[in-house]
């Protein structure tokens, strides 16, 4: 099939989708989204804030016109929109009129994307793939193809033959939230008292020095364990593969598993996850990973499985095996293709 893909290049997931489709023998054309705030000059952003709204309108219109011209030139079978950040109603309507299948793959919940916004887009979409399984209920009257499709892991980053030394006892990579900070403060206290190595990656505080000082004051035990920067998928994979235990702490508004779940399973580390995330058959609780009900139980899990390496490896290996043929990006895209070819 011929795919025309558009999306943001953040975090590397779009690149993984492109490589996986190409490796499967599909023709793939990519046109990146250029969001106004991340691509225009500082002065244009300032003028926009001062009321020159036409700057953004002109920017987005020019991007849409170029995308439509490229779609017409490439004549794909499928236009695949990743996450839909710049998918306007006018663009969706224009793409639907070209006769190509128009697929929206959401990488966040419908609540964040906008339920009303999605409702207006639906008449022009051939297929919608959702991040949260519960969001399928919001599409019950939608007559097009729909499926629950969480992001798969990048197989190229988790080569089974690679042999990384597991020199990190506990790791977590992600963005800050109130619940995550509460959990990690507790984990940091445990790691410090038990002389365990802990790695926490992500942008946890602003680069301005007073923000760093404020974070250090509020989280004095956690602070030394934090590497305060955004890690690439490659860097995150290296950390996970070096870890004995990886924590998966979900966001309050999300109920289905996040993409990190499959990356952690693929890494061969033992995954310990909060019980608020529904596995939806993508992994087995107590078999492939552990889920904790409260912080005391989480600390008990960490302490026990760091002390019993054999027990840790048993669960980690089961999770890695179960995950391999079910949750890779290749397997996930196969699900999407089946829905498009045999709806």
Question: Model features per residue range: what roles?
Answer:
Residues 1-51, 59-66, 82-83, 89, ...:
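Nucleotide-sugar donor-binding catalytic core of glycosyltransferases
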Residues 307-338:
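A charged, aromatic-enriched C-terminal amphipathic alpha-helix characteristic of glycosyltransferases
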Residues 289-295, 304-309:
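Conserved acidic donor-binding segment of nucleotide-sugar-dependent glycosyltransferases
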Residues 71, 75-77:
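Proline-aspartate-enriched helix->loop->beta-strand connector
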Residues 95-109, 129:
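Active-site proximal beta-strand in glycosyltransferases
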């Amino acid at each position: 099939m011929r795919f025309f893909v558009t999306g943001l290049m953040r975090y590397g997931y779009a690149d993984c989708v492109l490589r996986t489709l190409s490796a499967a023998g599909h023709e793939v054309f990519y046109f990146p989204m250029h969001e106004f705030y991340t691509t225009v000059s500082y002065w244009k952003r300032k003028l926009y804030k001062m009321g020159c709204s036409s700057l953004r309108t002109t920017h987005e219109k020019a991007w849409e016109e170029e995308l439509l011209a490229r779609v017409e030139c490439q004549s794909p079978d499928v236009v695949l929109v990743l996450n839909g950040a710049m998918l306007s109603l006018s663009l969706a309507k224009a793409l639907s009129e070209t006769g190509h299948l128009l697929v929206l793959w959401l990488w966040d919940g419908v609540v964040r994307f906008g339920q009303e916004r999605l409702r207006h887009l639906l008449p022009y979409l051939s297929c919608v793939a959702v991040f949260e399984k519960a969001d399928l209920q919001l599409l019950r009257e939608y007559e097009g193809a729909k499926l629950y499709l969480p992001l798969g892991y990048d197989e190229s980053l988790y080569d089974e033959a690679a042999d990384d030394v597991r020199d990190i006892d506990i790791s977590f990579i992600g963005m800050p939230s109130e619940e995550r900070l509460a959990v990690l403060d507790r984990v940091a206290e445990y790691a410090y008292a038990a002389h365990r190595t802990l790695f926490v990656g992500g942008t946890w505080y602003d680069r301005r020095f007073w923000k760093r000082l404020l974070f250090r004051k509020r989280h004095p035990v956690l602070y030394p364990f934090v590497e305060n920067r955004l890690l690439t998928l490659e860097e995150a994979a290296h950390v996970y593969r070096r870890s004995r235990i990886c924590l998966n702490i979900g966001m309050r508004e999300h109920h289905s598993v996040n993409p990190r779940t499959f990356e952690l399973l693929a890494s061969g580390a033992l995954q310990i996850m909060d019980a608020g995330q529904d596995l939806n058959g993508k992994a087995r609780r107590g078999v492939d990973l552990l889920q904790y009900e409260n912080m005391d139980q989480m600390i008990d899990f960490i302490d026990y499985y760091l002390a019993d390496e054999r027990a840790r490896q048993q669960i980690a290996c089961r999770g890695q095996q179960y995950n391999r043929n079910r949750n890779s990006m290749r397997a996930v895209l196969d699900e999407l293709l089946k829905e498009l070819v045999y709806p």
